[in-house]
Amino acid sequence: MIIAYLYCLAPAPAQEIAVLKYKGGGDWYANPTALPNLIRFCNENAGTTIDEKPETVEVGSSSIFQYPFLHMTGHGNVVFSDEEAENLRTYLYSGGFLHIDDNYGMAPYLKKALTKAFPDKELVELDREHPIFNQLFKFPDGLPKIHEHDGKRPQALGIFHENRLILLFTTESDLGDGWEDPSVHNDPEEVRKKALQMGANIIAYAFKN
């Protein structure tokens, strides 16, 4: 209740996002050029005015309540303490949004951590008709495949609270790699474009919902 009260008092910027720093040994800091590039793309193509240098906030910090959108990524282990799990849950139930992009290898650890934060909820796959795929840019086939890795199909998985999508987990897609500077992965321009457009859709959807 105290956290929720602080959330109401905090000067929350209308359009700001932050990187979520978590414990467990996973590289929460992966893809350092990804988010700034996505923000720049959104500011140029989606009418946003997001700070191009996103802040970093820890899962258990009250600072997360200052941001309507959090981004999380990595390859490895993810661990939430009881207090961190409660803080994240309160943030999301209070109107926040979390996008988690699997940088390949994160999924099994993340799902365990999410079970702790949301013991009564499950990740459910979004179908291709979900509005998140039809915001500024149209993705009739759903989440695009950016990097092949093991060739599995990309999935957009969500957690809902009171019919609102509060958490989006994108896996087997690697959107963040597509947002990075062109020199990092040497992706074709068309691949980077798809990744950035899907990212813009996610941000646009989160800001409106």
Ranges and model annotations:
Residues 32-39, 85, 89, 107, ...:
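Extracytoplasmic/secreted envelope proteins and their assembly/folding machinery
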Residues 17, 69-108:
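Short alpha-beta junction capping motif
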